[in-house]
């Protein structure tokens, strides 16, 4: 089936995917996607704007249609041109073309924490917190203070005595109910 089969068909009724299949069949060779689109546009007499609007769907159709096969680098062919077993061999794998060292050099990650310059720009993780020195100086003083105090620092709260003698607060304003008061309330009902 090629473009000759469409001579009696209204071109407005043809889909881009059908025309692309016929073009590849007539050519009998692989084609770049851009060339396929240009040939389809010429055959269907579509404007650039109309092709641009339909291009995403057309590309999706080529990917999902089982009659087409991507050869890599946006080059397309018909699946019927290849034996089933040969399909994997015909697909171009760009990662297999070069040696592995060049691929690794290309994908080498940069460690931003390794600095090659000397000076203030280099981060010293062993001595990065200026407060560490202050804490170590304070801890020596705290040890000396601990020797002077024989008791626990936590039990030296002087505010404990104030808990028993509360000032006139809300507690004094609350009334307390006795069991007799509860019995009186039940009798009234």
From Swiss-Prot:
Official protein name in the record: Probable DNA-directed RNA polymerase subunit delta
GO MF, any single term: DNA-directed RNA polymerase activity
GO biological process terms on file: DNA-templated transcription; regulation of DNA-templated transcription
Record gene name: rpoE
Domain of life: Bacteria
Domain HTH HARE-type positions: 14-81
Region (Disordered): 90-189
InterPro entries: Asxl_HARE-HTH, RNAP_delta_N_dom_sf, RpoE
Lineage, highest ranks first: Bacteria, Bacillati, Bacillota, Bacilli, Lactobacillales
Subunit structure and binding partners: RNAP is composed of a core of 2 alpha, a beta and a beta' subunits. The core is associated with a delta subunit and one of several sigma factors.
Family: Belongs to the RpoE family.
Annotated Acidic residues bias: 90-100, 118-189
GO cellular component entries: DNA-directed RNA polymerase complex
């Amino acid at each position: 089936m090629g473009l000759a089969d469409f001579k009696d068909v209204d071109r407005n009724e043809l889909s881009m995917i059908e025309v692309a299949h016929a073009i590849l069949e007539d050519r009998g060779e692989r084609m770049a996607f851009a060339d396929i689109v240009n040939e389809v546009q010429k055959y269907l007499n579509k404007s650039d704007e109309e092709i641009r609007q339909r291009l995403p769907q057309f590309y999706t159709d080529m990917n999902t249609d089982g009659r087409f096969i991507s050869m890599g680098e946006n080059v397309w062919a018909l699946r019927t041109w290849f034996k089933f077993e040969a399909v994997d061999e015909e697909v171009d794998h760009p990662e297999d073309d070069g040696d592995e060292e060049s691929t690794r050099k290309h994908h080498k990650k940069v460690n931003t924490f390794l600095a090659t310059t000397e000076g203030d720009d280099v981060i010293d993780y062993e001595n990065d917190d200026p407060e560490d020195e202050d804490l170590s100086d304070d801890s020596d003083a705290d040890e000396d203070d601990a020797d002077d105090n024989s008791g626990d620092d936590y039990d030296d709260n002087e505010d404990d005595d104030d808990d028993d003698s509360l000032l006139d607060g809300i507690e004094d304003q609350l009334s307390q109910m006795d069991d007799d008061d509860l019995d009186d309330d039940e009798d009234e009902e």
